[in-house]
Regions:
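Glycine-rich phosphate-binding loops of nucleotide-dependent enzymes
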Residues: 1-122
């Protein structure tokens, strides 16, 4: 479960988020909509580990956390699918799905597991 409470983010000219709260159960998929400047992108960047909140609490499975990087968010199971979806034209569908999260043992790709995970995602 992902639980954010009273998240606030201030930039020099604007308060982008002011006490935002959201709860997402494991396995749920949510879309965020709103007017330009409403703070959607800032909230997503905080959840994805791109930006740190100024205030508020972020819990993943009941444990307080602050993501220092997108890799930390992904490792915690928080994945952001950007609105401007960019695919690697030279990769197949499965490779695009797992891009950056390929199952590996050292430098070697575990192909059977990769195929299984990509198929499950479809």
């Amino acid at each position: 479960m992902l639980d954010i409470t009273d998240i606030t983010k201030q930039f020099p000219a604007v308060r982008a988020l002011d006490g935002v709260s959201l709860e997402v159960e494991s396995g749920e998929v949510h879309g965020v909509i709103g007017e330009n400047g409403a703070g959607k992108s800032t909230l997503m960047k905080i959840l994805a580990g791109d930006v740190a909140p100024d205030e508020g609490r972020l819990l993943v499975d009941g444990e307080a956390t602050r993501f220092g990087s997108p890799r930390e968010a992904i490792d915690a199971g928080v994945v952001l699918i950007h609105q401007e979806l960019s695919l690697a034209d030279n990769l197949d569908v499965g490779a695009n799905i797992l891009l950056g999260r390929e199952p590996r043992t050292g430098p070697f790709l575990r192909r059977a597991e990769a195929t299984s995970r990509a198929t499950a995602a479809l």
